[in-house]
Amino acid sequence: AELEPALSMLPSYTQLGMAALLPNKELVIADNDSGTVLVDGQSSQGTINRSKILSQATGGRAAATIYEDLMAMNRDDSRELLKANDVLYIYHNRIDHTGDKMHSEGQAFEAAEQTMEDLVRLIKKLAAANASNILITADHGFIYQNRAIEESDFSGVEAAGESILYRDRRFVLGKGLKASQGLRKFLPTELGLHGDVEVQIPKSINRLRLKG
């Protein structure tokens, strides 16, 4: 087995990371408040849409499923699924599910450890189903610190511009975003994206304040 580092997309979040790992010619962040990413004009939101994109790109020889569904299959069913597809994407969501919620975000490291155990079980099941090549990827990373977040952890500036479409603690999507000393602005072309949605990311590892 080999472990290789790779640079992810910016901004580093689920929708863009998952879309970038699909076959694509053009990635566009949707011009609305959803943060959804379009792959060659199609929404990549959800496993069903991602499976459709995979199937179209491979003449029906690729699909997507989730960890829980595959692990619930018996050996014959899992073998048939692999036999019907040259490529199979299997999504595992424990880390995101834990880390994205305020009441459980402190358990992110524990979730990462449990995920490693899940992946070992998954690899064994895939090997028993005659899978020949297995690649494990991550669609984005996360910032974790084992202490309470302090005032100094937040950026002292707030994103502003003609239109703020989507806010996250680590980035903002919008149009006509105004330059700021505490934020780094990227045009879509600088990030390998199409469309006209711009991105701002706090400098260093500072967070942005969210209302509510």
PLM segments and residue spans:
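Feature captures the catalytic ectodomains and active-site-proximal regions of enzymes
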Residues: 1-212
